Amino acid sequence: MKANIHPQFKTVEVSCATCGKQHPIGTTVNSIKIETCSNCHTFYTGVQTFVVKAGPVDKFNKRYGITQDQKVKKFPSNADNQKEPAEEQE
């Protein structure tokens, strides 16, 4: 068998993106980041929490400076759009 072909096994801290808690585990990877852990996952806690992230539309509106007031367009009603028929000229 060849010597020194196996990766180094070490203890690293797994960090949770939601709550920030760190858990030590043994692995060959240098660092691990996870979205949720047993400390903040709804299955283990019984409490539902929300992580607010901006979606693509929010990022677009922020980039181009569009506010909530500018998003609402007021269209004229149908009564305003109807014009009286033009009189026929003889």
Curated annotation (Swiss-Prot):
Residues 81-90 have a biased composition (Basic and acidic residues). Residues 71-90 are annotated as: Disordered. SUPFAM superfamilies: L28p-like. GO terms for biological process: translation. The keyword RNA-binding applies. It comes from the Bacteria. Signal peptide: none annotated. Pfam families: Ribosomal_L31. GO terms for molecular function: rRNA binding; structural constituent of ribosome. Keywords: Ribonucleoprotein, Ribosomal protein, RNA-binding, rRNA-binding. One of its GO terms (cellular component) is ribonucleoprotein complex. Binds the 23S rRNA. Part of the 50S ribosomal subunit. Belongs to the bacterial ribosomal protein bL31 family. Type A subfamily. This is Large ribosomal subunit protein bL31. It comes from Aster yellows witches'-broom phytoplasma (strain AYWB). The gene is rpmE.
